[in-house]
């Protein structure tokens, strides 16, 4: 929302985004660990989100701890560059979170999958999703100019590459899949590899970025699957360009649109026809998944979108009132819309639409 507001010059939207981010930064910190809580409810801030019942160990997750620090830094950077307002308190908070996460790495340089909500100590490891911590550390180094952690970041990057990316087996991303092999955790690594290339100029990171994107592209269909079930089959929705979520969840969702900038970065530094085609696919797919008018997808208002797009009959759990299946989920998913906005308002931004 903040990126979109800054691109559009929408002051009301920007104020709403800054208010939300500022509230989280001011109130969501766990004083016992120095990390940000992951959810909020009637009982206050906590780490028991909707995914909690599927977890084996309670506590903070490296996935969300690193992701929250990364996006806090990204928001500060964007609002300073395009909005003219610095947020040193956000940068300092994210830096303190990164420091706590760095202290919890294991001997391989891997960040925790789960951290204690009492002490911040690492309790469980073995996950690609914790690469969000590495992405946050790299972005903090870029924004502050503090390069003192580069050697440790290089060690962590090498571990994630060898243990997950090089094997083509990235698991432990989303918290609701019991560490199934998925397409989400690698999105954090993709960001980290791009940032480390920016920081060092080392060709190694560009090669690793290419390999990580090649893995992510395996979750994209190279053809448009024939769809008969509405609403997707009725409106001409294209399955080509989006990414399947994981090996245990057969639908396409929009999270891969968040790395449009990274795909474009690779193409700018190592031009390749295949990468250019996947960039074009992802960009086109990202522009067709929301209601362009009320109830275009048989529910909701203009601008609404879901997270679930069923390219097959594997997850058509949504039903119409007459009991017939629907090929999407009739739900407003803010994170899904935000994923598209992050990609479409980034480096590829075209004010002409």
What are these regions (language model features)?
Residues 1-353:
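Glycan-recognition and catalytic cores of secretory/periplasmic carbohydrate-active enzymes
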């Amino acid at each position: 929302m903040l990126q979109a507001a800054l691109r559009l010059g929408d002051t009301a939207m920007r104020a709403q985004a800054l208010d939300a981010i500022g509230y989280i930064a001011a109130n969501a910190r766990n004083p016992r660990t120095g990390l940000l809580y992951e959810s909020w409810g009637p009982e206050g801030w906590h780490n028991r989100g909707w995914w909690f019942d599927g977890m084996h160990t309670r506590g903070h997750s490296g996935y969300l701890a690193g992701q929250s620090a990364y996006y806090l830094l990204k928001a500060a950077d964007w609002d300073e560059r395009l909005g003219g307002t610095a947020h040193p308190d956000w940068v300092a908070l994210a830096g303190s979170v990164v420091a706590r996460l760095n202290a919890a790495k294991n001997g391989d340089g891997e960040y925790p999958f789960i951290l204690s909500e009492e002490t911040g100590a690492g309790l469980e490891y073995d996950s690609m999703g914790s690469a969000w911590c590495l992405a946050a550390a790299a972005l903090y180094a870029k924004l502050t100019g503090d390069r003192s952690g580069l050697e440790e970041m290089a060690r962590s990057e090498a571990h994630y590459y060898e243990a997950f990316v090089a094997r083509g087996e990235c698991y432990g991303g989303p918290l609701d899949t019991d560490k199934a092999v998925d397409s989400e955790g690698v999105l954090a690594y993709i960001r980290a590899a791009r940032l480390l290339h920016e920081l060092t100029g080392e060709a190694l990171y560009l090669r690793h970025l290419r390999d990580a994107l090649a893995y992510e592209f395996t979750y994209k269909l190279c053809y448009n699957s024939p769809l008969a079930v509405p609403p997707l089959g009725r409106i001409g929705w294209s399955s080509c360009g989006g990414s399947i979520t994981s090996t245990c969840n057969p639908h396409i969702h929009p999270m891969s649109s968040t790395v449009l900038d990274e795909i474009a970065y690779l193409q700018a530094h190592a031009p390749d026809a295949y990468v250019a085609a996947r960039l074009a696919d992802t960009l086109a797919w990202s522009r067709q998944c929301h209601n362009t008018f009320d109830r275009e997808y048989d529910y909701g208002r203009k601008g609404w979108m879901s997270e679930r797009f069923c390219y097959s009959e594997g997850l058509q759990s949504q039903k119409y009132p007459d009991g017939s299946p629907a090929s999407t989920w009739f739900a407003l998913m803010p994170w899904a819309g935000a994923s598209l906005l992050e990609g479409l308002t980034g480096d590829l931004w075209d004010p002409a639409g």
